[in-house]
C-alpha cells in the first residue's frame, strides 16, 4: 500500500512539472517587437488574442 502511494505521488509530481511554463522570463512580458523579448529563440512578441489590445512575449 505504501509503495503504491509513493508511486502515485511521484507520478503526480512529474505531471505537475510537465504542466509548468517552459520559461518564466518569457511569459506575459509586454513588448513592441521581438527584441523586447528575452529568453530562448522561441520567445517572440505575439499579437493580442481575444479582447486584448497589447502585444506580449510568448513561446507559443
UniProtKB/Swiss-Prot annotation:
Q: Where is the signal peptide?
A: 1-21
For the motif Cell attachment site, give the residue ranges: 49-51
Thylakoid: present as a keyword of the record? no
GO MF annotations, alphabetized: toxin activity
* Keywords recorded for this protein, A-Z: Disulfide bond, Hemostasis impairing toxin, Platelet aggregation inhibiting toxin, Secreted, Signal, Toxin
Q: How is it modified after translation?
A: Contains 3 disulfide bonds.
Q: Whose protein is this, by species? A: Ixodes scapularis
Q: Lineage, please? A: Eukaryota, Metazoa, Ecdysozoa, Arthropoda, Chelicerata
Q: Name one GO cellular component term.
A: extracellular region
Protein localization? Secreted
Instruction: Give the protein's recorded name.
Output: Ixodegrin-like peptide
Q: Which residues form a coiled coil?
A: none
Mostly located where? secreted
| Free-text tissue specificity from the UniProt record | Expressed in salivary glands.
Amino acid at each position: 500500500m505504501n509503495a503504491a502511494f509513493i508511486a502515485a505521488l511521484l507520478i503526480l509530481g512529474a505531471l505537475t512539472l510537465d504542466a509548468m511554463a517552459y520559461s518564466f522570463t518569457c511569459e506575459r512580458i509586454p513588448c513592441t517587437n521581438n527584441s523586447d523579448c528575452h529568453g530562448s529563440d522561441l520567445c517572440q512578441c505575439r499579437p493580442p488574442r481575444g479582447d486584448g489590445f497589447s502585444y506580449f512575449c510568448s513561446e507559443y
